[in-house]
């Protein structure tokens, strides 16, 4: 046994992070990495992030070029607008934003949660398994965005996440 590794028989966890109170912080600005393993440039591994925000992404969108985001809200709901349409995600629900998909997040107050990012494969619906129709992963339990579009001629800021770093560009919408 490695003497430098502390082993504990009790459950270990961290307390929730404080939501921002000084100024407006949107979803991307409030994204903080907690842990990770692997390398997004090699397309293998994962990362765990937390998000802490109190403001919507106005005229700002994000693209994750590294991997898929599985978002788990813990406090406050997320109104996510994707290229495929809107998704409203509340605490107790999860959502997936796939690699390369543009999105923006609107919030109605202090919001926090966790994100699992995978770099190698994509999230998929689980197989029904031996329980079949009585399983816990029926297609009817999964929602998807309903197509919606807006016609506007405005300048937007696009934040790209690539190789674990953020890059910003301007785009007319």
Model-derived features with residue positions:
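Jelly-roll (double-stranded beta-helix
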Residues: 1-173
């Amino acid at each position: 046994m490695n003497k430098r590794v502390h082993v504990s028989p009790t459950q270990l966890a961290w307390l929730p992070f404080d939501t921002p109170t000084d100024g407006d912080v949107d979803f991307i600005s409030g994204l903080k990495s907690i842990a990770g393993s692997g390398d997004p440039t090699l397309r293998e591994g994962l990362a765990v992030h937390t998000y802490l925000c109190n403001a919507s992404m106005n005229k700002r969108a994000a693209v994750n070029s590294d991997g898929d985001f599985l978002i788990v809200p813990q406090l406050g709901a997320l109104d996510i607008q994707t290229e495929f349409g809107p998704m409203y995600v509340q605490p107790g629900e999860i959502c997936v934003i796939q690699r390369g998909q543009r999105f923006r997040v609107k919030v109605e107050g202090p919001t926090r949660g966790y994100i699992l990012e995978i770099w190698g494969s994509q999230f998929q619906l689980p197989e029904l398994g031996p329980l079949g129709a009585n399983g816990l992963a029926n297609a009817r339990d999964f929602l998807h965005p309903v197509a919606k579009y807006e016609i506007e001629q405005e300048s937007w800021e696009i934040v790209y996440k690539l190789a674990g770093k953020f890059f910003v560009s301007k785009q007319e919408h």
